[in-house]
Every structure is written in structure tokens, then in C-alpha cells.
């Protein structure tokens, strides 16, 4: 075969290969068109998916940390029917507390992308429970985590994620710019309250379903602040309490009633010699009960109870089982402030049952270590220090921190009563440990009328991290 014949043969082969490739591409186009036509035809028949629920689940690995990006239920041809959370039921009768969630965020944060945060709290709608938290605009084990022991900065934001998940940029939802916050669901939408700005002129921004609906300007210009736990919704109205004034003396306290994020009523408490901060509030038979922190002068906790018209009663938990930290050793209680070792404090909670009270408190009387639940059958009204039950939550040797209440409504649980629950913040890092950062994880428990366990569920992270060395 001469040179010209070789060239002709090679050219012919190339031409044949090109034609075959072209035919294959045309075939692919035809198949894709047919597939699309079939799918389009199926979509024109809604009866195929009528009243069905299709679940899409996307997962990914980020820095070797498993993160569930979304788990969204889409009802074909249907929307989620809004309801109104009534809040008229009484608290469920309980005999103890069952562990509900633990996010292990500090342990996971040694390797994964986890927010530096504090002041976590939990709130539930009729469909889900979410963990809310105040970030520092930084991740664990990163240089921007340096100095995050500071409470108030322009970088702090309120965000939320599904309960029990470690809060990361991949599963968290932005809620508000805030260094003090609250949130709750009325059955139709999320209300968020985020306070930010300078100490002498902060502003609370109210959002309903993510849209700004109202604001509250600091009225004493001395660090306006709110609950750091969920607000309360009853029959379409939501309620919160705010403080403005000194943290170590008489301050000003206001109750607010809101509907769809708009303030419709507010009153200032007449409470001389009382100190209310960081109140943990819950609904009970159509009223709101708040148990708060006295940072001024008491070892026991103040409370305020009010109806939907903001008519209120005030007092201190009478029990000689004291709930604040630091505090005196248990002894003789008082239905006013117990002044011994009462300066400073920590956010906490209690649940009233008639004359009795479940008291959540640190095990240590002087530092934020350990946690326990105590049932005092007459502690709301009597001053002795006897109690009938104690359940261990965190060992004395392990760090705890803030704690607060949340509830699960009958519309979520299917029960005929409001289930009481609580969360505990497990603070790690500065100022007690050799790190450049301060952050926390959280655990939560819910009340049950069946078997429970006493144990310790600590944070468990091995410190310091690489960034700290």
C-alpha cells in the first residue's frame, strides 16, 4: 500500500469514527428528550402523588464531620396548616427527667467547623424543637475565637439549628444580630427578639417569620437585656420580660405582650428590692410563670407570674433549698430575698406544681460546676430545706453554666398537658481553662412520669485545642 492509499484509508476510518460519534450524540439527545417528556407527562397527573409526603435528604462531609444539611418534608399539593398554640393546659405530672438531647459541640469542634457560642436555649413549635444560640462570629479552633469571653460585641448573632445537632455554618439558620435574645413560636410563625448596640443605647429588634416587625429602645440606657431562653405564646399572643439598669442594684423590669411580632401592651413592674434578670418563663393554665436570676443580693430566685392582660404577682421561691449560684448552704428560706452570699448569680429555672417546686441548680455553691434537679414538695410556699427527691444531671467535677426552661405543647406531643423541659449549658474555655476562647455545648431533659436515671452527662471535650497551644 503506497502513501496515498494509507492517507485515504486513515481518512476514511476517521470519517467513519466521526459519523458513529455523531450518531451516538444524536441518540443521547433523543433519549434525554424522551425521558424529559415522560417526567413532564407524569407531573401533569397530580393524583399519582396526592396527599403523599416526599422526603429529600442531603448529606455531606465537611472536615471529616458529618453534617445533615437538610431533611425537608414536602407535601405534594398541600401546605402546613398553621394553628394557634393554646397554652391553656396545666403542666404534665412528672416523677423525674429523661434525657432528650446532647449536641457534643465542643468535642466535635476540635476537628469540624463548629460555632463559638454561648447562651444556648431551646424552643419548640408544634412541629419541631430547635436550639437557639448566640454566636461570636467565629469557629472553634480558629484564630477569630480569641477573646470570645466577651459578652457583648457587634459580631454576636442569634442563630438556630435542629435540636441535638452541633451548631455549624452548614446546619444553622441566621435569626438576628444580638448579644441578648429570646425566641418562641405561636403556632403560625417564629418570633425572635435580638438585642444589639452600645451599652448606653441598645435596641431590641423583633422579627416575625424573619421580617422586622417592631423595636424596643433601651429606656434606662444601662444594658437592655432579655431572657436568654424562650418567650411564651398563649392563644396567639407572645410574652417576654426585659431588664434595663444596674446588674448589682435596683433596675427596671418590663413585661411585653406581642402579636405577630408587634408590641400591643407593656407595663413596668413595681418591684422595689427585687432584681430580675435572664428569666426562664413557661405557660401554665393560660398564665405565664417566670423564674429569674437575682444578680444583686439573693441566694434564692425571684419569680413573676402574670395573665394575658399583664396583671402580675411577684415573689421569691420560699424554699430553703437555694437555686442560685453563688449561694448559701441550704438552710432557712425566705419568701423574699435570702441576702446571705447573694451577690452575682447565674441564669436558672424552676417549675411550680401547686405548693411544690422542681428546682434546677448547680451542685457547687460557689462555681458553675455540676447540676441537679430537686423536688421540694412544699418549697414554693414554705421555708424549710427538706426535699423528697434529687436527680443527678452533671457531676460536681464537671463544668455546667446557664440553665433554662422550655416546654412542649400538646399540639406537638399529642398529650393533654404541657410537658416541662429544661436545658443546661456546659461552658468550656476561659476564664477557668487554658484556652483563648469561651464556648459551650448543651444537654436537655424533659419531664416524664416513668423511669429515669441519675448520672453525669458532661461536655467531655479534651482541652486545650491546637489553636490554644
Curated annotation (Swiss-Prot):
Residues 11-33 are annotated as: Involved in apical transport and lipid raft association. Disulfide bonds join 92-417, 124-129, 184-231, 233-238, 279-292, 281-290, 318-335, 421-446. GO terms for biological process: carbohydrate metabolic process; viral budding from plasma membrane. Residues 34-469 are virion surface. It catalyses: Hydrolysis of alpha-(2->3)-, alpha-(2->6)-, alpha-(2->8)- glycosidic linkages of terminal sialic acid residues in oligosaccharides, glycoproteins, glycolipids, colominic acid and synthetic substrates. It is an enzyme of class 3 (hydrolase). Residues 1-12 are intravirion. Its EC number is 3.2.1.18. Its cofactor is Ca(2+). The keyword Heme does not apply. N-glycosylated. Residues 36-90 are annotated as: Hypervariable stalk region. The chain crosses the membrane at residues 13-33. Ca(2+) binds at residues 294, 324, 344. Glycans are attached at residues 50, 58, 63, 68, 88, 146, 235. InterPro entries: Glyco_hydro_34 (IPR001860), Sialidase_Influenza_A/B (IPR033654), Sialidase_sf (IPR036278). The active site is at residues 151, 402. Residues 91-469 are annotated as: Head of neuraminidase. Inhibited by the neuraminidase inhibitors zanamivir (Relenza) and oseltamivir (Tamiflu). These drugs interfere with the release of progeny virus from infected cells and are effective against all influenza strains. Resistance to neuraminidase inhibitors is quite rare. It is a single-pass type II membrane protein. Intact N-terminus is essential for virion morphogenesis. Possesses two apical sorting signals, one in the ectodomain, which is likely to be a glycan, and the other in the transmembrane domain. The transmembrane domain also plays a role in lipid raft association. The influenza A genome consist of 8 RNA segments. Genetic variation of hemagglutinin and/or neuraminidase genes results in the emergence of new influenza strains. The mechanism of variation can be the result of point mutations or the result of genetic reassortment between segments of two different strains. Belongs to the glycosyl hydrolase 34 family. Homotetramer. Catalyzes the removal of terminal sialic acid residues from viral and cellular glycoconjugates. Cleaves off the terminal sialic acids on the glycosylated HA during virus budding to facilitate virus release. Additionally helps virus spread through the circulation by further removing sialic acids from the cell surface. These cleavages prevent self-aggregation and ensure the efficient spread of the progeny virus from cell to cell. Otherwise, infection would be limited to one round of replication. This is Neuraminidase. It comes from Influenza A virus (strain A/New Jersey/8/1976 H1N1).
Amino acid at each position: 500500500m503506497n502513501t496515498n492509499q494509507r492517507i485515504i484509508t486513515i481518512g476514511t476510518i476517521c470519517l467513519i469514527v466521526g459519523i458513529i460519534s455523531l450518531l451516538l450524540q444524536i441518540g443521547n439527545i433523543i433519549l434525554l428528550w424522551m425521558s424529559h417528556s415522560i417526567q413532564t407527562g407524569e407531573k401533569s397527573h397530580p393524583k399519582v402523588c396526592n396527599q403523599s409526603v416526599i422526603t429529600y435528604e442531603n448529606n455531606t462531609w465537611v472536615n471529616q464531620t458529618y453534617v445533615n444539611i437538610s431533611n425537608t418534608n414536602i407535601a405534594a399539593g398541600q401546605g402546613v396548616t398553621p394553628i394557634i398554640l393554646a397554652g391553656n393546659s396545666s403542666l404534665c405530672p412528672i416523677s423525674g427527667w429523661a434525657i432528650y438531647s446532647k449536641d457534643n459541640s465542643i468535642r466535635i469542634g476540635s476537628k469540624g467547623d463548629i460555632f463559638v457560642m454561648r447562651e444556648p436555649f431551646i424552643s419548640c413549635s408544634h412541629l419541631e424543637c430547635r436550639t437557639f444560640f448566640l454566636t461570636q462570629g467565629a469557629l472553634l479552633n480558629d484564630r477569630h475565637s480569641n477573646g470570645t469571653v466577651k459578652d457583648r460585641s457587634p459580631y454576636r448573632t442569634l442563630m438556630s439549628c435542629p435540636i441535638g445537632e452541633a451548631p455549624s455554618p452548614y446546619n444553622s439558620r441566621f435569626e438576628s444580630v444580638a448579644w441578648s435574645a429570646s425566641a418562641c413560636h405561636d403556632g403560625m410563625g417564629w418570633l425572635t427578639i435580638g438585642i444589639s448596640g452600645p451599652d448606653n443605647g441598645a435596641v431590641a429588634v423583633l422579627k416575625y417569620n424573619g421580617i422586622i416587625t417592631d423595636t424596643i429602645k433601651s429606656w434606662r440606657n444601662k444594658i437592655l437585656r432579655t431572657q436568654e431562653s424562650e418567650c411564651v405564646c398563649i392563644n396567639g399572643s407572645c410574652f417576654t420580660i426585659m431588664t434595663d439598669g444596674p446588674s448589682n442594684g435596683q433596675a427596671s423590669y418590663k413585661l411585653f405582650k406581642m402579636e405577630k411580632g408587634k408590641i400591643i401592651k407593656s407595663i413596668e413592674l413595681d418591684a422595689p428590692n427585687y432584681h430580675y434578670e435572664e428569666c426562664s418563663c413557661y405557660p401554665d393554665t393560660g398564665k405565664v410563670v417566670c423564674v429569674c436570676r437575682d444578680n444583686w443580693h439573693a441566694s434564692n430566685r425571684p419569680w413573676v407570674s402574670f395573665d394575658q392582660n399583664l396583671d402580675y404577682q411577684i415573689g421569691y421561691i420560699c424554699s430553703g433549698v437555694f437555686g442560685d449560684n453563688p449561694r448559701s448552704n441550704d438552710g432557712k428560706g425566705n419568701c423574699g430575698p435570702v441576702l446571705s452570699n447573694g451577690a452575682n448569680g447565674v441564669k436558672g429555672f424552676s417549675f411550680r406544681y401547686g405548693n411544690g417546686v422542681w428546682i434546677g441548680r448547680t451542685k457547687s455553691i460557689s462555681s458553675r460546676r455540676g447540676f441537679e434537679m430537686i423536688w421540694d414538695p412544699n418549697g414554693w410556699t414554705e421555708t424549710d430545706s427538706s426535699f423528697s427527691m434529687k436527680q443527678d444531671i452533671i457531676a460536681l467535677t464537671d463544668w455546667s453554666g446557664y440553665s433554662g426552661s422550655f416546654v412542649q405543647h400538646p399540639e406537638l406531643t399529642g398529650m393533654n398537658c404541657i410537658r416541662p423541659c429544661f436545658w443546661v449549658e456546659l461552658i468550656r474555655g476561659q476564664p477557668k481553662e487554658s484556652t483563648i476562647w469561651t464556648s459551650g455545648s448543651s444537654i436537655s431533659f424533659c419531664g416524664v412520669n416513668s423511669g429515669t436515671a441519675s448520672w453525669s452527662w458532661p461536655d467531655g471535650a479534651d482541652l486545650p485545642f491546637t489553636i490554644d497551644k
